[in-house]
Every structure is written in structure tokens, then in C-alpha cells.
Amino acid sequence: MLVRLLYASRVVDSSPETIDSILTKSRQFNPTSGITGILCYGGGIFLQAIEGGRSAVSDLYGHIQKDVRHKDVVLLHYEEISERRFGGWTMGQVDASRVNTNILLKYSERAELDPYSVSGKVSLALLEELMATASIIGRA
């Protein structure tokens, strides 16, 4: 059974090296676990969608909650799915500082990434629009 999970977290260290480390680890681990998804980051905040088998997604989310690089981890949305929306990426990435501010304003009160202030469904809609507008990079 496929599931999709969205979560938000604050990054402890927002240096490019830390972001690269997280993405590299994801891209190494995810293919062997059948995980796909997207990571959007900006202003020290992560918004991530993870898709895959229920056990694999649950295990990965458990690891993320314990990962010292993340704090304030919050589950935004969880659902059973019939197909993946982010199946083309072992972990696609979006740097929110490079996104057209009109896209962010469409889904939030301010032109910044803040999944803590919107619903999980709104966060999912934002990620889907970022995918549709080719804002996602890192097709590994």
C-alpha cells in the first residue's frame, strides 16, 4: 500500500553543506527503500513530502523525528494513495528563496515558506504547483 506523508521541521544548521548532506543521504537511502519525494527549504524551514510503502515511510519519518539536524518536526498530512505525485524524484529539491513570490503568496499570508501556518492540504497544493511550474531541481 502506497502512502504520502508531509511534514515540516526547522533545520538546526541551515548551511548549504547541511542541506546537501540531507539531500545526499536521502538520494542514497530512498531508492533502496522505494521512497520518492520532494524537499522544499527556506528561511530555516523544511517542508517535505515522502511517498512509498507504508512501513518504509513510517520508518523514515521515525528517523527524521530523531535526526539531530531537525527540530520542531510536525506531521502536516498523511494519506493512502493510489499513485505517486512525486515519483520522478528520489528526492527533488526546491530552494524557496528562488521561487516566484507570487506562488508563495497564493498559499500563505506572506511571501515565505511557512508550513506551520497553513494546513497540510495547502502545503501539498504548494508542492504540486512547484512541481507544475518546474521549480523543482535535483531529479536524482
Show the residue positions of the predicted features.
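Charge-rich, low-complexity N-terminal segments
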Residues: M1-A140
